[in-house]
């Protein structure tokens, strides 16, 4: 999986992309991340990449010429790449979108800045617009890091266990169950006995119910589209009855 990241600030990516899982994935050749400095494609000696908006208004707009040249340069090495613009107006990024993008051969990610990019960049080059949340960042670099990290988890071999991505929060539409490791007791708090029982059926049942409970408490909106069995629905109804009696 190849990621071409178009940015005005390539140094921002030094830490997040050169440590931990992403570092090992790159060393194994499972992913490739290539940074392209948009300033290198400016047409004037001052490397200007932004200008005042036509019609007036606050802030600056990223110019079309440097971005067009940078995108076309990236496409030489990744001709079938999907071009993504990080922007608050894009579709919401989530687990399913990350899995979808992981099926692409390559992604070209444009990191927006200032008041945004010249609309002609969208019209001529952009295949998809992605937002990581209903808030505004200084630039698209942080969003690009999120995309690379989340998408890479679906690339075969990137995670230590093939089950890791499957069992992550949101993989089945629910939040993940609580996790414990040694020691078995810490400051009076012990590990739930079921996890020490060796009974895998009961462990699976406990984990499922914990996921349901956590999701109902913190992200009830996820339950609408979650894959729920009859047993799941009965348990959720039981939780509602208990909550109602406590209230």
Curated annotation (Swiss-Prot):
Keywords: Cytoplasm, Methyltransferase, S-adenosyl-L-methionine, Transferase, tRNA processing
Gene Ontology biological-process entries: tRNA N1-guanine methylation
Record flagged with keyword Methyltransferase: yes
GO CC field: cytosol
Record SUPFAM superfamilies: alpha/beta knot
EC number: 2.1.1.228
The keyword rRNA processing appears for this protein: no
Localization annotation: Cytoplasm
UniProt GO MF annotations: tRNA (guanine(37)-N1)-methyltransferase activity
Chief localization: cytoplasm
Cysteines engaged in disulfide bonds, as pairs: none
Annotated positions binding S-adenosyl-L-methionine: 112, 132-137
Catalytic activity annotation: guanosine(37) in tRNA + S-adenosyl-L-methionine = N(1)-methylguanosine(37) in tRNA + S-adenosyl-L-homocysteine + H(+)
Subunit-level organization: Homodimer.
Record function comment: Specifically methylates guanosine-37 in various tRNAs.
Family statement: Belongs to the RNA methyltransferase TrmD family.
Record's protein name: tRNA (guanine-N(1)-)-methyltransferase
